[in-house]
């Protein structure tokens, strides 16, 4: 039995579709091999809601569309020695960033006041709701990101390659065949 310390890995999802986490599951049975070397900290895959302050690797999918996303990202970065941006939304804002060419007020007006079928529409003003940002931002605009796994979503093989390279003490390198957008 190995006495090597397992690395703590945390994952979270911000403004995205959760497709990157689904790709994480596409590692399939190799997850069992991975679990010999890592333990999950905060992750929707495990339903653990908090990140310990000594997490080795943090993986984030999704961009930043509201104040809560920014807060979660900063706390996550503070607790993780290595931070990986996973997927197009985390790396460049992805599909949510398509709203960036319109003012936020125009978008809110369309969604809550002028959309077909709305009667007596009003823009929510509830302190429990996170404040939307004027634009969607990729995570590297707010915190330092150590590695990027591109794709929409990235393949399970790409995620596997980055994690196994890091576990082996190597700089992750994704070959041409591992980077794609489905």
Give residue spans per PLM region.
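Iron-sulfur-associated redox domains of electron-transfer enzymes in respiratory
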Residues: 1-182
């Amino acid at each position: 039995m190995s006495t090597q310390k397992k690395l703590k890995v945390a994952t979270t999802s911000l403004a995205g579709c959760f497709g990157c986490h689904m790709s994480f599951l596409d590692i399939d049975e190799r997850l069992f091999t991975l679990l010999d070397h890592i333990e999950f900290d905060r992750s929707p895959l495990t339903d653990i809601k908090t990140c310990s302050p000594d997490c080795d690797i943090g993986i984030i999918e999704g961009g930043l569309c509201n104040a809560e996303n920014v807060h979660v990202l900063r706390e996550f970065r503070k607790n993780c020695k290595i931070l990986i941006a996973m997927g197009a939304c985390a790396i460049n804002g992805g599909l949510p960033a398509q709203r960036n060419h319109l003012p936020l007020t125009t978008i809110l007006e369309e969604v809550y006041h002028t959309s077909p079928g709305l009667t007596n529409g009003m823009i929510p003003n509830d302190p429990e709701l996170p404040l939307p940002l004027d634009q969607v931002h990729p995570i590297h605009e707010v915190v330092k990101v150590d590695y990027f796994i591109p794709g929409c979503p990235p393949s399970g093989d790409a995620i596997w390659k980055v994690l196994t390279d890091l576990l082996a003490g190597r700089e992750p390198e994704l070959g041409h065949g591992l980077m794609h957008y489905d």
